[in-house]
């Protein structure tokens, strides 16, 4: 029973950390993005509220639900102590690491939301930032960046949430000595994350009135060209008429489905989409490097015993990349509807001659086109794994088919939640939360089945 409690605790602790980190970041980001979409953030800036009250107030209010969920989970983790193999000190360490990660993830999401104008850009940058943080810090902890040196492992433990949560959940953690607190890697992680959270909030406090309103919203006041009382009304100059005529002739041909045309042919999601694609390509390169290292070392083809069974080595770099791809597809789908509603544009679309089929399939096709990299690049990684002999051709077909189904499900789920929930924050939370819970829930179930492969009773 002690081994069962230890393994169960080491599975639940990273799961809770992952959920809390992503939920905190996305809730904080969506809370600020909703204020921007509705135009109420500018009204808040015009009040007597200070920058500190505005930034910290929005952050703490958005993290309240996540903190309550974390508090409710504490008694459940305490029950694991009854199985043996886990101490209350380990539970406290795990919750301290999780709470610090929640603060830094929420601060990152809030700062990014205050910086960006479009909701999709905010959610994409938030999710990719969390993944990059986890991937790069874990690479440093494993010695893949700075080499196998002792200092790299110490620095990696201080900045890597995965290494910190595993160190906190480890039963044997030395705490002796006069400098035990400073020498503890978990303590260094807490110090580093709290410092980063304070730094992010300071940047947001100092720059909130510089970033907001954005340049796109700062329209120059129009000149007063109305005639005064008693003055004759003169005709418009010929140059103005020629300009109007030229502007009228320079229109573009709209497709039969105007919704699809707008999604594909215009910059409907802002001018910074190229930066999001570049960041995603960076994550793809890191994932490809991790997969190549796994294949080169032979870990991707290693067969372990039932007692030492764990998640396959090739799945470790691929699973986070697949998750972030689904999250971006889902985020674009739900924000494509919520942005239309918050800007009151959907009311105008409802009075046109557009059919529901044109609107739905136009949005769905636009989401698939804009996120084509997030749909195709995971398939490329699967093909690389097949070419190296990691999977058979039959399994490759199943992988590609499953990815297409999951991408379509994520896109349709986002559109459904955006249309079903009137509140944008609720729609975004339900949509992204469903993707996270389904993906991580199934992955955790698989890990538990593999970890307890030697005991049917434990499974």
Question: What is the role of each PLM region?
Answer:
Residues 31-63, 259-264, 268-269, 337-369:
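Helix-loop-helix units of permease transmembrane domains in multi-pass membrane transporters
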Residues 1-23, 30, 65, 69-72, ...:
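Transmembrane alpha-helical segments and their membrane-interface loop/helix boundaries
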